[in-house]
């Protein structure tokens, strides 16, 4: 039974905003079509103009190949003031629409995808079906994907270490993207098939994502030393742009998509830890003090009874969540539970990133050792690693989910470290990756959010996705194939659209322009929301 909930001012605002964008984009495409079919007149000076336009289009194509829509729209968009651009858009000025046709297309596609989300999850146009777990089928599908990936996408990389210039490749980008990819597939299959027996493994995967947040952000800020407002804004856009519109269009709380607020929080904490007194980051004692301070903050907020509620209480409007199936729980219960499980692991990621150059030097020295000594050391490392992993598996992993969750915040670093050691103990392992999983690893945020609405179904605001989207009723495997294909395609497009629109609206080196865009966004959204609110009040 579908319960779309009451129409909200946010949903009306979205429609009022997206309709003019659709109209503007369609009109711009019509203008471009007319322009391309203008016949050339013999011996006319207009031909020179047409040829110039063709040359400009070739330049635009070159820009497209070099960086997507990164350069052209954003530069053109700011040649005049925000106010002038809005007036030109509302008046449907031909030259403006032609200049920004690519941006209008991206915004229209993004809006159309969100409407598709609503149709799939909040209407009865498409059906739903129940989840069914079969261990044999679950393992068959996952192992089959690994085999296909290994046969078709195994690649060897020749990247050099930025530290030493040698091919060490310890925890390289290809490897971490692959890591995210194979974990994400299991995470999604866990939801689709309701594979409750791997619950503890899923907790480790989420901890690994948070570990990467600490590792990746620390590595960037420590090396690049870029704490600019633009970088911060781009980071927040990447994490929250898509999910914000999902919350608006589908009338969901932010915490329904708990991965997003978790990563936002821990990203902010890494940013704050390295950004404060950043000029002293090269001093080891200062960095030790900063990492200790991170542990202390986490301890005070999560370990001391009552401190969490006091600190986060004012943000209940943003981080609060009530599961319709569990209405008696406190609004901050979900945030406390989710953030608490991985409260320390992001700091472990920071520590690993800090010592990353040191470990690379050790590995470099090890590779230069004589063969017998090198093999002996590697054999000892692998033996100890496997032994530690086995003890953890027997003593911690095999606990029931409630008991396991009690130990998880303090032990999740163990399986992560075991995986890192085993994945990197030979040069051959470090230099290869499965690019299919790496490709999936790049769109983990989009696949995580999209699964709620176009792969699974919740059927109500703030509902957990307890059902499967059914496009082909009565044929569960064919339905799985079709919905998965659409779901992955849409997720990839959302990844590209998010980055495309980021380049348009979040400039990299112009804080004044960034601030103007921010103010313009508020100036457009606020009247739309107020007008929508009044419309709904009149209707009711």
From Swiss-Prot:
Query: Which Pfam families does the record cross-reference, listed alphabetically?
Result: Cas1_AcylT
Tissues expressing this chain? Expressed in cells undergoing secondary wall thickeningin a SND1-dependent manner, such as xylem cells and interfascicular fibers. Mostly expressed in the middle and bottom parts of the inflorescence stems. Mainly observed in the more mature parts of inflorescence stems, but present ubiquitously.
Keyword terms, alphabetized? Glycoprotein, Golgi apparatus, Membrane, Oxidoreductase, Phosphoprotein, Transferase, Transmembrane, Transmembrane helix
Documented EC number(s): 2.3.1.-
**Major place of residence:** Golgi
Q: Which organism is it from?
A: Arabidopsis thaliana
State what protein this is by name: Protein REDUCED WALL ACETYLATION 1
UniProt similarity note: Belongs to the PC-esterase family. CASD1 subfamily.
* Membrane topology according to the record: Multi-pass membrane protein
Q: Per its UniProt entry, which superkingdom is the organism in?
A: Eukaryota
Which Gene Ontology MF annotations are present?
oxidoreductase activity; transferase activity
Q: Which PANTHER family match?
A: N-ACETYLNEURAMINATE 9-O-ACETYLTRANSFERASE
Q: Which residues cross the membrane?
A: 7-27, 134-154, 182-202, 203-223, 235-252, 257-277, 291-311, 377-397, 436-456, 470-490, 518-538
For the biological process aspect of GO, one term held by this record is:
xylan metabolic process
Q: Name one GO cellular component term.
A: Golgi membrane
Which InterPro entries is this protein grouped with?
Cas1_AcylTrans_dom (IPR012419)
- Residues that bear Phosphoserine: 44
Q: Where in the cell is it found?
A: Golgi apparatus membrane
Q: What happens when the gene is disrupted?
A: No visible phenotype on cell wall acetylation in single mutant. Severe growth phenotypes (e.g. dwarf and abnormal flower organs) associated with reduction in the secondary wall thickening and the stem mechanical strength in the quadruple mutant rwa1 rwa2 rwa3 rwa4 and characterized by reduced xylan acetylation and altered ratio of non-methylated to methylated glucuronic acid side chains. Absence of interfascicular fibers and xylem cells differentiation. The triple mutants rwa1 rwa2 rwa3, rwa1 rwa3 rwa4 and rwa1 rwa2 rwa4 are also dwarfs with abnormal morphology.
What residues bear carbohydrate chains?
79, 424
The free-text function statement in the UniProt record for this protein reads: Probable O-acetyltransferase involved in the acetylation of xylan during secondary wall biosynthesis.
């Amino acid at each position: 039974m579908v319960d779309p909930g009451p129409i909200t001012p946010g949903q009306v605002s979205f429609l009022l905003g997206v309709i003019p964008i659709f109209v503007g984009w369609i009109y711009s495409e019509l203008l471009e079509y007319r322009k391309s079919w203008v016949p050339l007149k013999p011996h006319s000076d207009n031909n020179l103009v047409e040829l110039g336009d063709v040359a400009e289009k070739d330049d635009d194509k070159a820009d497209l190949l070099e960086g997507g829509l990164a350069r052209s729209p954003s530069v053109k968009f700011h040649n005049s003031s925000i106010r002038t651009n809005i007036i030109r858009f509302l008046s449907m000025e031909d030259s403006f629409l032609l200049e920004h046709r690519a941006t209008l297309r991206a915004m229209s596609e993004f809006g159309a995808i969100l409407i598709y989300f609503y149709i799939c999850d909040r209407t009865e146009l498409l059906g739903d079906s129940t989840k069914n777990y079969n261990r044999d089928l679950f393992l068959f599908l996952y192992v089959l994907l690994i085999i296909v990936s290994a046969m078709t996408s195994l690649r060897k990389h020749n990247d050099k270490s930025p530290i030493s210039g040698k091919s060490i490749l310890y925890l390289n980008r290809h490897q971490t993207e692959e890591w995210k990819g194979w974990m994400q597939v299991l995470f999604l299959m866990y939801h689709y098939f309701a594979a409750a027996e791997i619950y503890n493994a899923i907790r480790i995967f989420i901890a690994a994502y948070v570990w990467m947040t600490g590792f990746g952000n620390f590595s960037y800020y420590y090396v690049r030393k870029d704490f600019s407002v633009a970088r911060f804004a781009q980071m927040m856009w990447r994490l929250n742009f898509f999910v914000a519109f999902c919350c608006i269009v589908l009338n969901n709380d932010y915490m329904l998509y708990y991965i997003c607020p978790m990563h936002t929080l821990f990203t902010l904490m890494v940013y704050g830890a390295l950004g404060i007194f950043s000029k002293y980051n090269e001093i080891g004692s200062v960095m030790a003090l900063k990492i200790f301070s991170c542990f202390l903050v986490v301890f005070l907020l999560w370990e001391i009874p009552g401190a969490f509620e006091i600190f986060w209480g004012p943000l209940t409007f943003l981080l609060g969540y009530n599961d319709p199936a569990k209405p008696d729980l406190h609004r901050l219960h979900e945030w406390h539970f989710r953030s608490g499980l991985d409260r320390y692991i992001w700091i472990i990621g920071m520590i690993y990133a800090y010592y990353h150059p040191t470990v690379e030097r050790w590995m470099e020295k090890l590779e230069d050792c004589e063969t017998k000594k090198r093999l002996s050391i590697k054999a000892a490392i692998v033996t100890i690693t496997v032994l530690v992993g086995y003890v953890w598996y027997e003593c911690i992993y095999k606990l029931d989910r409630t008991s396991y969750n009690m130990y998880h915040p303090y032990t999740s670093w163990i399986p992560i470290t075991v995986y890192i050691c085993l994945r990197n103990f030979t040069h051959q392992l470090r230099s290869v990756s499965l690019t299919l999983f790496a490709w999936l690893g790049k769109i983990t945020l989009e696949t995580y959010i999209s699964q709620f609405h176009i792969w699974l179904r919740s059927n109500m605001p703030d509902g957990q996705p307890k059902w499967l989207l059914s496009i082909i009723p009565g044929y569960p495997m064919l339905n799985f194939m079709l919905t998965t294909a659409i779901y992955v395609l849409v997720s990839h497009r959302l990844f590209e659209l998010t980055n495309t629109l980021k380049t348009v609206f979040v400039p990299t080196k112009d804080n004044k322009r960034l601030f103007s865009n921010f103010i313009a966004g508020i100036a457009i959204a606020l009247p739309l929301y107020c007008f929508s609110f009044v419309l709904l009040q009149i209707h009711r």
